[in-house]
Amino acid sequence: SNIPVIIFGGRTPISEHSHFGCRNTPIGYGQEMRDQAALVRESVKWDFELRYADQAGEHVDRAWAIANSLPKGPVYLSLPREPLCETFATDSAALNCRPSQQPISFSPAPDSLSMAATLIANARHPVIFSQRGARTRQAFDLISTFVEQWAIPVVEYWGTEVTISAAHPMY
């Protein structure tokens, strides 16, 4: 439903010895799934398994950007026990930086906008049918102003996000 979510899933250890967090009890063998991410792979936009603790910041950054790119949706990060047991410097630049990867947003080609404007201007009774909403506050305000100035009704059929206010005269 276009909702950005980061899902974290813990895993049993991936190593047999020599690493803090390795398998040290028999229960780890019985509970291990060969491909845990397969449970969610068909329902998420991206999945990844963290292998080293000091990469947590960059992978969460990437997960956030992908989850928030249109169409927004869930992503999955698998966390084996070893990286969760590792120690690393918490003042690491990778952990304490602003997001480096930004969500992607799409814009129509300028000639497509021109064509749409011509169709709307020449329509006898234009109506806007919407489902996915305005997406941003700026778009919400622009659409609200546009439909009021042009007296174009907006119908939200099976809406998942709001396009204009339900109190708007053109709603």
Residue ranges: model-predicted function:
Residues 1-171:
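N-terminal alpha/beta PP-like core and its mobile active-site loop of ThDP/TPP-dependent enzymes
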